[in-house]
Amino acid sequence: MAGTATYTVVLGANVLYPIAVIDLIVSLAETNLFHARWSDSIEAEAARNLAEKRPELADKIPGRFAAMRRAIPDCIIGHFDHLIDKLRLPEPDDRHVLAAAIVGHADAIVTFNLKDFPTDYVRQFGIE
């Protein structure tokens, strides 16, 4: 883990692209309040969604995510694909987020889609 933060969060795609939200999260992570992490697949989903909603920003998206990666060392989680098919969520397309959280030893998942991550199910993996 980078820095001195002991609380780790995995960021869902929907919190990676609203500029005010992610700027706040990155700023707080830089103070070591918590360690923010995500995966390449979460980042790709966020970039795709942002490009759809704000096509005029398409050429700036790669630079934005590169800056986030530089600001938060060790933010990318990998090697979780083996878990995806074993997980059960209301929205199967979100299993990669939970798998990343498990492998990344996250304490919580930060998302606006709370209904897609049932508390009782996610808690069994030690995740809020």
Task: Briefly describe each language-model feature range.
Residues 114-128:
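Acidic, PIN/NYN-like endoribonuclease modules and their adjacent C-terminal/linker elements
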Residues 33, 105-106, 126:
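Residue-level detector of structured alpha->beta connecting loops
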Residues 73-108:
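Active-site neighborhoods of divalent-metal-dependent phosphate/nucleic-acid chemistry enzymes
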Residues 1-6:
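Intrinsically disordered, low-complexity and often Lys/Arg-enriched segments
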Residues 8, 19-53:
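PIN/NYN-family metal-dependent endoribonuclease catalytic core
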Residues 8-14:
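Short, hydrophobic/glycine-enriched beta-strand segments
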Residues 37-81:
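PIN-domain endoribonuclease scaffold, especially VapC-family toxins
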